[in-house]
Structure formats: C-alpha cells, structure tokens
Amino acid sequence: MSTMPEDIAAAQRLEQACQSLGLAAGAEQQEKLLRYMAQMQRWNRTYNLTAIRDPEQMLIQHLFDSLSVVQPLVRALQAGQPAKVYDVGSGGGLPGVVLAIVQPEWDITCVDAVEKKTAFVQQMAGTLMLPNLHAMHARIERVAPADCDVVISRAFASLHDFANLAGRHVRPGGTLVAMKGKVPAEEIEGLPAAWQVERIEPLQVPELDAERCLIWMRRSQGTL
C-alpha cells in the first residue's frame, strides 16, 4: 500500500516536534504514535472518543500536546528509571498512551469512567504491542489506592476535584500533575489544604499558539 503525501507530512512534522521538545523518540516509536492517531481517527467516527475530529488538529492538540509533558516528567522521575503512572480521566489515552509509547520503562494505567474509551486504550495496548500500558474502566474515587509515583490528568477536573478524587493514589513523596492551559489562579487558591502547588511549569507545544502549563502538586507538610 502506497504512503499518502499527508502521511509523509505528518511523519516529518512529528519528527520535527520531537526534536524541538528534546525527545529521542526512535523511528519505531514515532510510527506507533502516528498509528495511534490513525486508530483514534478511525474509532472516533463510531465511538466519539474526542470532540476534535480534524486530523490536523488531532496531531497538534492531542499528540504534540501530550508529547510536551514527556521531558518534564522524565526530569522529575529520573531518566531510565521504572515509574508507576496513572492517567486519570484519560479519555482515548491522552497523555497515557503517548507516555507508554515513548517511555517503555514506565508502567502506565489509563483510568476513565467511559467504557468505550478504556476499550480503545486496551485495544491500543495490543495493537501497538505496549505491555506497559493498561486500561481501567472505573471512577477514580472508587479505585483502591495505587501508590503511584505520578498521577496526571489532562482534561479531568478542577485542581480541587483532581486532588480530592485522585490524590490518594499518589505514594508518599509522589506528585499530582495537572495539564492546563492558562495558569488557573482561582483553582490554585481553591486547592484542599492537604495539597500545595510545588511549581508551575510553562509548556511550549509545537505548532500551537496557545498557553499551556503543568501544575505540579505535592502533599502539604504534615499530611499523609
């Protein structure tokens, strides 16, 4: 089967995005990332995994956006070390599937309350041969504490609800990480007392002219 020009262009743009983000993603990993996007487009026609349907915007707002958090997480978790990560409210696996592809030493679980979305993630674990990727159909507040190094969310809830519902899955010394657009000052002020913002890290998403940041949160001193 011949390769379409738009596929070649997407591959070139992905390679450039990885370079600009400082990611050493190999050819096989980049191919899996593009296959993941193609499968999301295909499933989206039937199962409505995401409101974004344009392939161009999916590449930027889903794939590149998710890739932008990899290096910050690598720095926090120490490169090459195993880590346990929960992606809460993962939807179709963003950023969890992307993390599983580019960081095979991390054990990634994508948690979502919508069964068709976790079914898609489970399918991707098999299709893309990702033994480190798992899907969990559940409400995060009903899941037994998981003792994670990082619990991350991209479009799950306010910081208050994220900390209240998912914070118990973070091991002592671990981190809650929220992917946000503009710095959510009001949400930060509304954080539960048990959690505090450690730092706010600006993100630069390739080809996206919009504000993005990571909110890093740890337990307040004296809390378990």
Curated annotation (Swiss-Prot):
CDD domains assigned: AdoMet_MTases
Q: What is its main location?
A: cytoplasm
Quote the EC number.
2.1.1.170
Q: Which InterPro entries has this protein been placed in? A: rRNA_ssu_MeTfrase_G, SAM-dependent_MTases_sf
Compartments, as annotated in UniProt: Cytoplasm
Task: Describe the family membership recorded for this protein in Swiss-Prot or TrEMBL.
Answer: Belongs to the methyltransferase superfamily. RNA methyltransferase RsmG family.
Q: What is this protein called?
A: Ribosomal RNA small subunit methyltransferase G
| UniProt organism field | Bordetella avium (strain 197N)
